[in-house]
Amino acid sequence: MAILRSKEIWDMEVDEIQDKLVELRAELSKNVSKSAAAGVIENPGKIRELKRTIARVLTILNEKQKEN
């Protein structure tokens, strides 16, 4: 999954953002468990980027909900 930029998230509806958040959390969980089981994953920076993207999504989601 591609990393989402702020502009892309702002252009989404709240329902879309929540769906994307579920997908990102599932992907993070999969990567963390793969890292714990195998010890080595293909792209170790992916976990960090997923965490940052989740934080970005949550921040924008909270701002959008405060606007309404």
Curated annotation (Swiss-Prot):
Gene3D superfamilies: 1.10.287.310. One of its GO terms (cellular component) is ribonucleoprotein complex. GO terms for molecular function: structural constituent of ribosome. Keywords: Ribonucleoprotein, Ribosomal protein. Pfam families: Ribosomal_L29. SUPFAM superfamilies: Ribosomal protein L29 (L29p). InterPro entries: Ribosomal_uL29, Ribosomal_uL29_CS, Ribosomal_uL29_sf. GO terms for biological process: translation. HAMAP family: Ribosomal_uL29. Belongs to the universal ribosomal protein uL29 family. This is Large ribosomal subunit protein uL29. It comes from Methanobrevibacter smithii (strain ATCC 35061 / DSM 861 / OCM 144 / PS). The lineage of its organism: Archaea, Methanobacteriati, Methanobacteriota, Methanomada group, Methanobacteria.
